[in-house]
């Protein structure tokens, strides 16, 4: 089993001098493989959330190894786990707060505090989201409060004999890649549930399974990652590309350290964290299926853009013909329409060139994999 993680500060945080709000962890504790990501909310209200996210990592590490995760589908046991994580994080935030009081905070301490309200005021300062995934001897389990996405990549369930360069034998909508943790409508735009919520333990979502449903990989990504890709398909493709570099934890972490700052600059400009657990044996058996999955979606994208290209080309020709009519001579609105749709046509044509180049790369990868399999037979 391979575990790895990386966190990078967002380009907007670098530019403004704000601290990185994300924290992550991946590793093995006994017979438990664990990945964790937490994202502090930031802003004046959550002024210590960069610390809160790191404390969330510590809370999960301290609690989870003492819980039998085979009980994940028992509602009472599961709720106990979530409650203990929230309570542990709360204690850690209170300890940190009183160990690091500013002079202004000391001056504002009430003589006879309302304990419950004081705890609430403290935890809000450290507010953050939390995601964790575990692979244990009996199966796997993942849970989350707040935004970000957990993406699971699964083995193909049937052994198909794929002809060379023929991807049609793999059903496009087969659930090779899923977001198994249910979504939460309360996590929208800049709104999110949080460890600092009054009833945080009841706001966790989860998924899991036994050994027979073990994923090839479980990826956790903070919202800075998924907000950079625009579509779920693009996000899933990113994680499949990461899997192709999973020769070792060191190599893939090095690649993420190179890629994430560039992604932040071009995308969300937010902090970014990825943590993952990868079953290397399952990956070796399924990497060809994943490449074919990419080929299918690339072919679909090409077909959609070809149709769009044909539509725009026909529209531009029609508008240009219309512009030759005497009654439209010098019509500025018509010329603006022609210019606009011509720019759209250029964009689609450029996108098609990029997709065609990508399809060629993927076909080369599947051919190389096929040749490697033949050489080992």
Where are these regions (language model features)?
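Helix-loop-helix
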Residues: 58-101, 170, 238-261
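Conserved catalytic motifs of the protein kinase core domain
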Residues: 31-33, 138-141, 215-217
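Flexible coil/linker segments and helix-coil junctions enriched in charged and small residues
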Residues: 94, 99-116, 165-170, 316-339, ...
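N-terminal entry segment of metal-dependent catalytic domains or homologous docking segments
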Residues: 1-65, 148, 197-208, 268-275
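Short beta-strand scaffold segments in enzyme catalytic cores
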Residues: 23-26, 128-135, 140-144, 149-154, ...
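PP2C/PPM family metal-dependent serine/threonine protein phosphatase catalytic domain
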Residues: 4-18, 103-123, 127, 152-213, ...
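Short hydrophobic beta-strand that contains or immediately precedes a catalytic carboxylate
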Residues: 35-39, 143-145, 219-221
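C-terminal catalytic subdomain
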Residues: 192-377
